[in-house]
A protein has these predicted regions:
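Charged, compositionally biased N-terminal leader segments and the immediate start
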Residues: 1-3
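Core of folded catalytic or high-affinity ligand/protein-binding domains
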Residues: 7-135, 139
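A cross-kingdom marker for long, charged
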Residues: 141, 145-156
């Protein structure tokens, strides 16, 4: 019988094997308009570097907000809370966002309601969706995306 540590290590190895080719440069080679290609462009526009590996959070950020501004980062957390994703990290980011951007509370609440209206997607394996058109993914899960805003450079 596997111990919990062995199970975690097995899942980690599987994840590493599945994501080893998900650099921004490899992702932009996906067909035009697909989630994979748009994710690669998102990572390059955000100045994350050519060899950065895409992660689940990057895909969610792209699907929901299309940008990585501080306000949109916080709005994504509210969206995911509305979609049923809970966690201390998420709640901490939301509290910080409300304290730092109190004038955006109505926007955050709107995003929360959009998350409630969407089908549950926060725990979907996005690796299997990279070849699909991004608009189709959004339509399938009823994701109401924000219009893309200018991306901020990493570390700014």
């Amino acid at each position: 019988m596997e111990t919990m540590k062995e199970k975690i290590e097995k899942v980690r190895r599987e994840f590493d094997r599945n994501t080893q080719n998900l650099t921004a440069l490899n992702l932009i080679k996906y067909p035009e308009g697909t989630l994979g290609q748009q994710l690669g462009r998102f990572l390059l526009r955000a100045n994350y570097g050519q060899n950065v590996y895409a992660c689940h959070d990057d895909a969610l950020q792209l699907l929901i907000a299309g940008s990585n501004s501080f306000t949109d980062d916080i709005a994504v957390q509210f969206y995911l809370l509305g979609n049923g994703s809970y966690g201390l990290r998420r709640l901490t980011a939301m509290v910080a966002g409300v304290l730092l951007k109190p004038h955006k509370i109505a926007y955050f609440y709107q995003k929360y309601n959009h998350g409630k209206a969407a089908l549950r997607f926060y725990d979907v394996d996005h690796l299997g969706l990279l070849h699909l058109p991004i608009d189709r993914v959004r339509e399938t899960f009823m994701i109401q995306a924000s219009p893309p805003a200018p991306l901020r450079k990493r570390g700014v």
